Amino acid sequence: MIRFINRIHAGHLRWPYSTFWLGLFILSSMMVACTPKPVWKSYHPVSQDSYPGVHWEKADYPEQLGWSSEKLALARNFSKAIGSDGVMIVDNGIVVDAWGDISRNYQCHSMRKSILSALIGIHVEKGDIDLSATIGELGIDDRYPSLSATEKKATVGDLIMARSGVYHPALGEAASMKGMRPKRHSHAPGTFWYYNNWDFNALGTIFELETGTRIFEEFDRRVADPLQMEDFNVGNCKYLSWSDYRSAPYSIHDYYLFRMSARDLARFGLLFLRQGRWKSQQIISSEWIRESTANHSEWGQDGGYGYMWWTGIHGGLLPNVSLKAHSYLASGYGGHKLIVLPFRNLVIVHRVNTDSVGRRPMSHQIGRLLWLILSAAGEGDIGPDPSIAAAAGKKLDQTDLKRLLKNGSRWMIPNKGIFMGGRHLVISCTTDGTMLFCPYEETEFKGKWWISGDRFYFKILGLRSYFELIRNGNFITLFDATGTMFGEFEAPSI
């Protein structure tokens, strides 16, 4: 019934302008206030793989599935500390635990890319999309300065792997993405990986041209309906053009904005965990699932990238937790994560209310949350406890910090999934209080640093916070305001 009502098109209404916006405000407020409370189906142990029906099946208590309620409480408390708004944990198709607002259709941000990847996979199988076709052959271009003949040699496959070599301004770029965007024409198609919103937006254009469908409606038909998603609503999704952004670059390729609830994203994640099969129906080919979540590019020291899915190598995927291969996730601005762990038959969803101003959990914090969740599952081979409470060594006091930074300091931190960039993140602190953050050799962000008490404060990329530093032997470890490890560097003598 809810999904039927959601299909009513508000565009047919003809209200006076001011009344329309007042009504829209009241309606949206009511929708937030009336977010449906999750309905759970009672858990009944079965030997085969479980799938949700109209509602998810939930264990009466975590110990039914071999989990620790006490350790899950630690995860829940930490998620509140970092600003999480919804968490859902699914073990072999059964909900172990969930908290926060898991039925609200939050923005997906860049998780949209993994969703589009799934739709592309369906239409590659149907023969509608050819990954080897060049964007020139498909008639893809952009506003001035338009694409060169070389750029038009990029294939659809290059775009889906973020290797197009087209560095035209794009919609929806964060400040960090703009700052790290390579110079135009600096890399040939297929030769260099860069997390490129132009590629992702142009793929939306290509998808609709080649399939003759609209992205949101096609997702509703091909995925949401057969998976019996409880909250997904095409009317909540929308396209954003350059006219919707302030000071936006001139690009003809729209940003396709998905909204989805945690419990519906968990169904999408379970579909991938089950190799594209939902009960008796093969919705996405298992070959596409394997290919799209494989490592096609590498970044940092243990990060990989597939077909618009983030992957891990050497135990990586998120900072502060060690994972077995092959694990992968969809990621969106502000801390949105859909994590799929086939080695443990788990799907974990993390949501944040990015419609309002508030804390934005960072990757190293979500990695610690995942560490706590896996600890509650009884996993032992997940790396050391990344909390400051478990750290060995001496905490640097104000005198130590002043000595460390007296003549400036340069910290080279191994980039283990901390920030999209190269193998090391470099933080340089000059004597005048300037802080430089370099995720790549040729990319630099400028901020400020200062010392107050026994804390190293900083303000950069819109973030104001602090680190506490602990020295253990030849290394100094940085811990953030939540007591979570950020990274470590080889310690100079002080």
Regions found by a protein language model. Name each.
Residues 114, 202-206, 256-278, 336-353:
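Active-site-proximal alpha-helical segments within enzyme catalytic domains
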Residues 243-246, 250, 294-348:
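Active-site Gly/Thr loop motif
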Residues 2-8, 19, 24-28, 34-102, ...:
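N-terminal leader/targeting segments and the immediately adjacent pre-domain N-terminus
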Residues 49-60, 70-77, 112, 121-195:
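Active-site-proximal loop and beta-strand segments within enzyme catalytic domains
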Residues 125-162, 211-255:
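Active-site helix/loop module of the DD-peptidase/beta-lactamase fold
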Residues 96-100, 165-241, 252-259:
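Catalytic-site signature segments of enzymes, centered on catalytic residues
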Residues 387-494:
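Lipid interaction determinants
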Residues 93, 107-132, 159, 203-207, ...:
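Active-site SXXK
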